[in-house]
Design a protein with these regions (language model features):
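Catalytic center-proximal scaffold of phosphoryl-transfer enzymes
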Residues: 2-3, 121-123, 132, 159-161, ...
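Short, flexible loop/hinge motifs at secondary-structure junctions
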Residues: 1-185, 257-258, 319, 398, ...
Length: 536
């Protein structure tokens, strides 16, 4: 049986070819639109349910519902082994040694409790002689907690008279002792109390309203308004001079990281209570040896505030892609590869691989760059610059060439990533010429994270002065943490000693209280020490 054939003239053939081409083009557009809609749905799911961490182990695993449960439930492991000196836990196929008891309690005092025999038990049951202690053996360790104790200290000024002068002249020479300076006149506030309030709010994220309830349970009627006054007055009077000195030290650094976040201030002139203000943060990197984390409150997000703060600074400024930083003159702008990687991550569909997703290619390029930076991290600035030009520069050349081959759908997350990369190319490449610069803005982002977490608890500031005071205290405690200090101990020391310097202390006096000085480290990092039973 022969094949049936249909005769088609040339015009009909061209029309069919054109129709097939149009259908293929329409199909491609619809597939692109479908991919875009799936991308929007995936990002909505991520925003609502997903893991916010950017650690690479959470990415490219195909899941979207990460971190759905509360921390206690998500982290609970009924088979978890209590840490000991020799314990090594093996989750799945990886081995990671857990911290030992000694490491977990390294900064705690130790009380030794000897379980001894009573007088009756000291009598030997065989011969009637007396047992003598010949040794001791550690059987167990337990972590104990002593609730805080409050008491009132009354300071009395003592007067002394010279009886010899009185005998000779009839008038006694009288001297009177000087009591320690007060934080505030006619107030119960002490350095320890105010430091405790500040630490609980700005380090532990405990709002003053909750602190008020804690004081009530301890039998003390201390209102949140009183605590607020303590924080504001002590920050403005005693901590602000050191805060300003920290700014001067920061501007002398060669690299500054900058970022900002929202803060709501209820009673701000000319603005509605629901309007947004800004908390700016500036930080140097750890290569300086003197870590500084500086917060500054401003009524809005205008780049003029960054320009004013950084006036006179001529080093490298590491930021995200916010255009407001373009107003800062005289600096070398450096971009953030963490932001770049985040754009690729957000553009990756579920289950993305390099074979199925162009965004996964961009994400992989970024991961390779970060892997190189990890290898370079211990190098000096000069050697790191050379290493980057040898190993990182070829990687970036390939990255930028690959980027030019992309033609993403308008409005897609992939298009956002490509646009960000092209707009930031100059800034993203700047680190190649500056070995002292890190490739991400993580120093500023990590510094501002405690503020963002605390904001979830206390929600807003009442007044601009309160917001400014919060900026001062956050600067002090975050800089203390960056320098390895205990924030409470450092605050207590500052509030004890700074009043002796008066309200306008000299710069050289303030330098003695910077958190990286040897004396401050000695007093504000708690050493491990042994305490005998007789001492407690």
């Amino acid at each position: 049986m022969g094949k049936n054939t249909v005769a088609i003239d040339k015009n009909e053939l061209e029309e069919l070819k054109k129709a097939a081409h149009d259908l293929a083009e329409e199909n491609a557009q619809l597939r692109q639109k479908l991919d875009h809609m799936n991308e929007l749905l995936l990002n909505a799911q991520r925003a609502r349910f997903g893991q916010s961490s950017e650690r690479t182990k959470h990415v490219m695993q195909g899941g979207t519902q990460l971190g759905l449960f509360n921390e206690a439930e998500a982290e609970q492991d009924h088979k978890a082994v209590e840490p000991t000196e020799n314990t090594i836990v093996i989750p799945e196929h990886t081995r990671k040694a857990k911290r030992t008891v000694d490491e977990l309690t390294a900064n705690l005092p130790v009380k030794e409790v000897l379980i001894t025999l009573s007088d009756d038990e000291l009598i030997c049951g065989k011969c009637g002689g007396k047992y003598e202690m010949i040794g001791k053996k550690l059987v167990s360790r337990r972590l104990e907690v002593i609730p805080r104790q409050c008491y009132v200290v009354e300071y009395y000024s003592c007067s002394y008279a010279c009886k010899s002068c009185e005998t000779k002249t009839g008038y006694a020479n009288i001297v009177t002792t000087v009591t320690p300076p007060m934080l505030m006149k006619h107030s119960l506030a002490s350095a320890s109390t105010v430091a405790n309030v500040m630490t609980q709010k700005y380090v532990d994220g405990l709002p003053l309203a909750r602190q008020e309830k804690i004081w009530e349970r301890e039998g003390i009627r201390l209102s949140r308004a009183t605590m607020s006054n303590w924080v504001i007055q002590c920050a403005q009077t005693w901590l602000k001079p050191l805060y300003r000195r920290m700014k001067k030290a920061l501007l002398e650094c060669s690299v500054i990281h900058a970022d900002e976040t929202v803060v709501q201030v209820l009673k701000e002139d000319g603005k509605a209570a629901v309007s947004e203000s800004r908390m700016w943060v500036y930080a140097n990197n750890d290569r300086s040896g003197k870590p500084i984390r500086y917060f500054e409150y401003q009524p809005d997000r205008s780049g003029k505030h960054a320009a004013a703060f950084l006036k006179g600074f001529s080093g490298c400024l590491v930021t995200d892609g916010y255009a407001g930083y373009n107003l800062v003159d005289g600096v070398i702008r450096c971009g953030c590869w963490s932001h770049m990687r985040r754009y690729w991550r957000e553009a990756m569909p579920k289950g993305a691989t390099k074979e199925t997703s162009k965004a996964a290619w961009g994400y992989d390029y970024c991961n390779k760059l970060f892997a190189l930076e990890k290898k370079f991290s211990k190098m000096s600035d000069v050697i790191r610059k050379t290493a980057r030009q040898v190993e990182a520069e070829p990687l970036l050349e390939a990255y930028w060439w690959w980027l030019e081959t992309l033609d993403p759908a308008p409005g897609s997350k992939l298009a956002d990533a490509v646009t960000y990369a092209k707009n930031q190319k100059k800034f993203l490449n700047a680190f190649l010429e500056h070995g002292e610069v890190d490739i991400s803005n993580n120093f500023a982002e990590n510094a501002i994270r405690p503020f963002v977490q605390g904001r979830k608890a206390w929600l807003f500031c009442d007044t601009p002065k309160g917001a400014d005071s919060s900026a001062i205290v956050y600067s002090i405690v975050e800089t203390a943490k960056a320098n390895g200090l205990d924030p409470y101990t450092y605050l207590k020391l500052l509030l004890t000693e700074l009043p002796y310097l008066g309200k306008n202390p000299a710069s050289d006096k303030l330098d003695l209280f910077m958190p990286w000085t040897a004396a401050i480290h000695k007093n504000c990092i708690l050493p491990t020490k042994k305490i005998s039973p007789e001492d407690l």
